[in-house]
Amino acid sequence: MSSSDSLADAELPDINDRLVEPDTPYEIWDGEVVYVSPAHPPHGQRQRQLCALIDAHTGPEFQSAADLLTRTSRIDDIAPDVSVYPAAPNPATGGRQLEHLAFEIVSKQSLRRAGRKAAKLAGRGVRRVFAIDIKRSRALEWSAEAGAWRELDPAGHIEDPALAVPLPIASLIHDARPDDAVARALLAKRNPVLMQERAEGHAESRAEGRAEA
């Protein structure tokens, strides 16, 4: 990192320094207070599904949260719909570390406005920002280099060090209960409860086989 980059980081406020009161329906965009209206069913339902999916696909080293405020600049304090960030606190400040992944659901707001938020998050250092476009049933990733959204292959997966197992893109864009995708992720992570259930099932099958012999 160059000395100019270090100076720029030092001049930024901590990500946990608030411009707005937490747990209120407001964000700060370019120094102006912006009211964020409560979600309607399509947005709220997809956000709930997304939270379940992200929780299932992250490992113990990361946490996920909904509507988590992040101070991206001196004049911006904004909250992605879902954030994925390190579970360990920042060793320098003791506060939360910057998220590695951010997800924004596009329903009532425009993709252009979601792009403005993505640019602010990426400018602060968030590694990857995604958008779930409900109306067009597609997922996109923000390209800081191009300053635009890039559509993702619906048959593909999101692979990232913040994820314990790859996240299927189809599960993000289809309006369906995420149970199957969550179950597959937990099996891939060798969830202890599921592993115990599987072992007990195998033991019962072997016992039944011996009894029938």
Identify what each model region corresponds to.
Residues 1-208:
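Gly/Pro/Ser/Thr-rich low-complexity, intrinsically disordered segments predominantly at protein N-termini
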Residues 213:
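Phosphoinositide-driven peripheral membrane association surfaces
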